[in-house]
Regions:
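Extracytoplasmic
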Residues: 191-220
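Positively charged n-region of N-terminal signal peptides that target proteins for export
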Residues: 1-7
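C-terminal segment of classical bacterial N-terminal signal peptides
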Residues: 14-23
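Short, linear, compositionally biased motifs with a strong N-terminal bias
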Residues: 10-11
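Active-site-adjacent loops and short helices of periplasmic peptidoglycan-processing enzymes
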Residues: 24-191, 198
């Protein structure tokens, strides 16, 4: 589990801090990350953290509290709240989720859900986990909280509960996020919510270990 968590968080951070800042990578020299053993590790990522799953000990860090745009890594918190709702019995995997006009209008990564289309919670989680689907994420936010703004409020409450001091969410997708708009997170905070998702909700591995699947569109 320690190794899996480490690999997962490093993979997450490669997307979180390399892709959104790829334009800056060539301008910024590699820098050293500080490990718990005192050994310097040369990293080109703008920020990084490696956390031991069981204890929460920081094994390696570099600019861990720097606030940066999280992009689709935002969906780690979205998935955390979905798994939480499942385990609390508020929703079931077989429940139908209706897609609103707003959810269907999401751009970016999506599975092209149509207005009034219905899918099960199980399928929506697949779409979010495998395709990073913005439309499915918003549909699930509306299913759980009634609206995306209400769901985002829950995301920020959970972030506070987890001690994520350098995070603020403005949406449940990470779509069109801008640090100036107030949507940001940090390497350490990503580590905290990744640990919460993996350690507290192991059922997510059913979805996160799948790299491809198909869905059938269902419209009324």
């Amino acid at each position: 589990m320690k190794q899996l968590l480490g690999i997962f968080i490093l993979a997450v951070l490669s997307l979180f801090f390399v892709a959104p800042f790829s334009y800056a990578q060539s301008k910024a020299p590699a820098g050293n990350a500080e490990s718990s053993s005192g050994q310097a590790v040369n990293l080109t990522a703008k920020a990084a953290v490696l956390i031991e799953g069981n204890s929460g000990e920081i094994i390696l860090e570099k600019n861990k509290d720097t606030e940066l745009v999280p992009a689709s890594i935002t969906k780690i918190m979205t998935l955390t709240l979905i798994m939480e709702a499942l385990e609390e019995g508020k929703i079931q995997l077989t429940d139908s989720v209706s897609v609103s006009e707003y959810a269907a209008s999401m751009g970016g990564s999506q599975v092209f859900l149509e207005p009034n289309e219905t899918q099960t919670v199980d399928t929506m989680i697949k779409c979010i986990s495998i395709a990073s689907a913005n439309d499915a994420a918003v549909a699930m936010a509306e299913k759980i909280a009634g609206s995306e703004p209400n769901f985002v409020k829950k995301m920020n409450e959970k972030a506070k509960e987890l001690g994520m001091k350098h995070t603020q969410f403005k949406n449940c997708t990470g779509l069109d996020d801008d640090i100036k708009s107030g949507h940001f997170s940090s390497a350490y905070d990503v580590g905290l919510m990744s640990r919460e998702l993996i350690m507290k909700h192991p059922g997510i591995s059913k979805y996160s270990t799948v790299w491809m699947d198909t869905i059938t569109h269902k419209t009324k």
